Amino acid sequence: MKREHHHLHPRPDPPSMAAAPNGDTYLNTGKAKLWEEDAQLDGGMDELLAVLGYKVKSSDMAEVAQKLEQLEEAMCQVQDTGLSHLAFDTVHYNPSDLSTWLESMITELHPPPSFPQPHPSQMNDSSFLAPAESSTITSIDYDPQRQTSSLIFEESSSSDYDLKAITSSAIYSPRENKRLKPSSESDSDLFSTSAIGASNSATRPIVLVDSQENGIQLVHALMACAEAVQQNNLNLAEALEKRIGYLAVSQAGAMRKVATFFAEALARRIYRVCPENPLDHSMSDMLQLHFYESSPYLKFAHFTANQAILEAFEGKKRVHVIDFSMNQGMQWPALLQALALRPSGPPAFRLTGIGPPAPDNSDYLQDVGWKLAKLVETINVEFEYRGFVANSLADLDASMLELRPSEVESVVVNSVFELHKLLARPGAIEKVMSVVKQMKPEIMTVVEQEANHNGPVFMDRFTESLHYYSTLFDSLESSPNNQDKMMSEMYLGKQICNVVACEGSDRVEWHETLTQWRTRLCSSGFEPIHLGSNAFKQASMLLALFGSGEGYRVEENNGSLTLGWHTRPLIVTSAWKLGNNSVVVTH
């Protein structure tokens, strides 16, 4: 079920609507220049506050600031006695009209003496605390050419944008009577509540924070900041980036975390501070281990690739796996155990692991080989291992790998989340595919992100990555281990920073979709291989280990297998072989 929120326009007045060709309705976001024109038409509304949904005239800023001070003092004065005299049925119809809203809050805190007290039966009525319908952001469509945006929200039980009931102990210290101080960046941040009410329970007073409204403003601020960056309006982008941080605080769960990482990435792009050491192998390996434990994505990648490799090795006596993504070797114990159980006996297994150099120049690939060697001793598999350190797969040469004739040894090439890194260097992917063809593999297994983060237009890349990583973070919320989840979020946060903040050779996350990879690989002389139905069934069983598989979806896509969260595919496994007309060029 999808709902379009037509009140997301940055101005509180009824927004102008435009119909898209597919019938969807877009809300006019406007650009910086249009905001200025709108401000003049709206009687001098403050530009920055208007784009974030607050209706304040520039001439009224001093009055609003004075009302904020009055409200602050009033709230501090009633801390000892609580806020029980507030009328629970008061409705602030337009909190975006900041001046009027503050006036109503002040009036309610200091009611005239003649006002009647609420009836006890009314004080017992807690219907205003009924939970709102839960929703989460799972799709964002943005078209900068039309200068419009459509913010689409889908229902999900994994994220919470309900009204938050916060007890007084969460706001005021029981031992100290502290004075509330609004942020110096924006005085209105402190008063992002939609209503203030009271009851006769022991947890009085209760303040309701409308995190759903703030969530809407948060997404709008992210999109507006990205557009300002694209237009090189850095002053506006800087102000919006700071605003994003304040709005993110009011959110819970995945939305707050995603917004925080994207805010950092935008700040780095604004100030031109690219993250250091994007290829820090030791850190990436450690974070990837936690990602492996907290979610099924890497397990799915290894499992489906191993299934295709196992079928390709059927009946072979000597096999050779060339792994472009060795890391900690987590993929291979399961395959070795499966080969050991073959009715005809295990083949002789040769493994060549390729990885980037370690920052401390340690021989981590050799350590991985020793661990695997200890494993094969227990399962009686003949094992041979060699590790290669390479700054890039494009530096690889087939002559380095000591290849043996195909009649003697069957070769398989495996790549998990590695090929997209080659797209930063012109001609690199073509060179690697040429080397792979010289290896004459039985099969090449490829696992990549199902996302297009490689477009030339920054807004397109930002919108797609915001959608993609919001879905990924949403799926991680079901992880039972908080430490694994936190480290997994850092693992994905590094990717977000690289996608958004970096350009050129500094950017390594050049993700593309299966359709794009199919075009690339077919043009390089490869043909797709259909992954068997056994892989599909067993991958579906794997998901039962993660929250009974709820939310995760395995789908078949033209012979490839995708794993996604609800309706969004996130990673894809495909298998390839040399085409019949493929020409192998040796150097």
Curated annotation (Swiss-Prot):
Keyword Membrane among UniProt keywords = no
Q: Principal localization?
A: nucleus
SMART domains in the record, alphabetically?
Answer: DELLA
UniProt region (VHIID), positions on chain: 288-353
Q: Which Gene3D superfamilies match?
A: Transcriptional regulator DELLA, N-terminal domain
Q: What does this protein do?
A: Probable transcriptional regulator that acts as a repressor of the gibberellin (GA) signaling pathway. Probably acts by participating in large multiprotein complexes that represses transcription of GA-inducible genes. Upon GA application, it is degraded by the proteasome, allowing the GA signaling pathway.
Q: What is this protein called?
A: DELLA protein GAIP-B
Which organism does this sequence originate in? Cucurbita maxima
